[in-house]
Amino acid sequence: MRKFTLNDGRIRFGWMCLLLLAVFMGVVVRLGWLQIVRANDLRKQSENQLTADLTQKHPRGRIVDRDGEELAVSIMTGSLYVDPEGMSDDSLAAKARPQRDVRRIAADLLAPVLKMDKERLYKTFTGGGRFVWLKRTMDPKEEEQVRKIIKENKLPGLHFLEESKRYYTKKRTAAQILGFIGTDDVGLSGIEYQLNDVLKGKDTKYSLMVDAAGQQILGGLVNDKAQSVQKKQEQLPTVYLTLDSKMQYVLEDAMDDAIARTHAKGAAAIIMDPYTGEILGMASRPTFDPNNFNKYSQESWNNKAVSMIYEPGSVFKPIVGCMGLTEGIISPNTIFNDAGSIRIADRIIHNWDGEGLGYVPFSTIIKFSINTGMVQLGMSLGADRLISYAKKFGFGSPTGIDLPGEEHGILYNPKMMYEPDVATMAIGQGIAVTPIQVLRAICAIANGGELLKPYIIKKIVAPDGSVIQEGQKQVVRNVITPEVASQMRAMMEKVVSEGGGKTAAIKGYRIAGKTGTAEKLAEEGGYAAGKYIASFVGFVPADKPKYAMLVMLDTPQGAFYGSQVSAPIFRDTLQQILVAKGIQPTNREGLPSFDMMNTTDDKAKEKPKTIPQILLMPNGKIKLPDFKGIDMRYTAELLQQGHLRLKPYGSGIAYQQKPAPDTEVVEGTTVEVWFK
């Protein structure tokens, strides 16, 4: 065996040095590759492991009525998210409690509160990743419960982030007008959709830092800029609508009452300023609560006031009458022969009651809604003029109102019209319209001939108070002369005072209007048997109109004539509004004085001992005051404050009421008050 020599030791030492050098060089090369080549990738992986990317939603701008009363506001509320890796067995928090399954405990405790399936929640907790939303914009009570569970059970990886939640202060009131937003803070319908770019702030994106246990690091934000953005919320404009909240409430209440009484499939009502085009009130049925819009059918989201198309029936007759007056074919005194029915080609058209009045002036044709006279006028006008004037009055095209979802309506091509088509159009059939189109056209009669563009956005105000945008009166065109408008107003006033619209009369006030009853169009074409559209449109006072209103009921059950079901809604709604707004009767004949000191009734002279007030009780009910000694206007205002409905008897000063003073009632209750 060869002896180990000094030279052998040197050789082995050399090999060891070479080996160490190779290892060292390998480490250097590896570090260099990681530091230079993969630096960006590794940095991203590190950030992904320690941060969660979030988007901060800023509160949307407010929506208020014409007087600044809030309709839609944003409040800050907690949104719950989980860091699944922070709940894993490898996290420091989990290792500190090795005897329990944190994820199972969290799923069992939170599922009932969050109204989520336990197993689905458990899978979320075990799915990995650093950030998963569990529930966004929670209710305050719900958030409080969850925070308590997390704290008491020391559950890791569960955190809250403050987010903006939209709140509609009056619930169902003006629901279709306001619309609603989705979970991503984007407007999905109504004004929320129409002005989404104005109301929605810019999203702030930032990263939330977490420690090895999955707990949010103090401060929580990766950079100082993001922290300052979260602390200082973006200020956004306020949108003022033309709506009057008090009038809107009365209108909504009237719609609810109408649906309850008639069992109609749907309804729409609009109140408009006939001289400016401002929408003061607008309601649609069925309706919904935008705070919980997903609990309602999509049909309830639709605003029938602008989107429903139907044949107008007799409410279209004043429009055709204006055509004849403008063309010089007729005057209010032109005599027509009403035989009760009339044959046009192979079609026989009857009056609504089948009766004939003989020789009568055109004013009587309008007053009693006589089909035969209107057909004769329509045939004299002819297809071309009928369609041309209908277009001038705004039919067949959208009004341009600043709301989404408006329909155009349908007009014939005059070249395709046969004689029966001309005849039926003259009585409001064979033409499809929307409620807003009809009301706008009638407003042209009310205001002296101006066709206006209706609008519902009064102004948009910046946070500093400057006006960004302001709605204004827009005259689309003059469709008739003031003389023609005056003649038709007089005839429409006779409809209410002497004709088929008596059920719309309000004692002491001059009302002009027109009833309408039309067969409902069937989806497959033709008409739906036994289904009708009942409507009434009018304005008050007849000589100097302040309010124009349309009421339309879709398929009422039982009574279905416009005079039976729609005209009374017009009357009851405007009666409350006229009193509340202090608009005095123009005709005091048969009416007691509104002045308490002029009455001869001792009870009516009795002054209120204290100023009556509506009191909201702890149980949510409303305590009625004693209305004795106050006038109808103040009574109506008080009841509107409590979302109560007034059913007045007489006029002047209150002396009796039902329910009695101090009775506790719920919202929507009708309070009967007698005045002298």
Region roles according to the model:
Residues 3, 7-41:
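Hydrophobic alpha-helical transmembrane signal-anchor segments
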Residues 508, 522, 551-555, 561-567, ...:
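Ligand-recognition elements built from short beta-strands and adjacent flexible loops
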Residues 50-52, 81-99, 107-111, 128-137, ...:
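Second-shell loop/turn segments in exported
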Residues 55-59, 263-266, 454, 648, ...:
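Short, small/polar residue-rich loop motifs at catalytic or cofactor-binding pockets
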Residues 58, 74-86, 184, 281-287:
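Short beta->alpha transition motifs characteristic of CBS
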Residues 105-112, 123-235, 551:
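Small/polar-residue-rich segments within soluble enzyme cores
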Residues 72, 213-230, 269, 274-314, ...:
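Beta-lactam-recognizing serine transpeptidase/beta-lactamase-like catalytic domain environment
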Residues 222-267:
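Conserved, well-ordered alpha-helix/loop/beta-strand core segments that scaffold catalytic motifs
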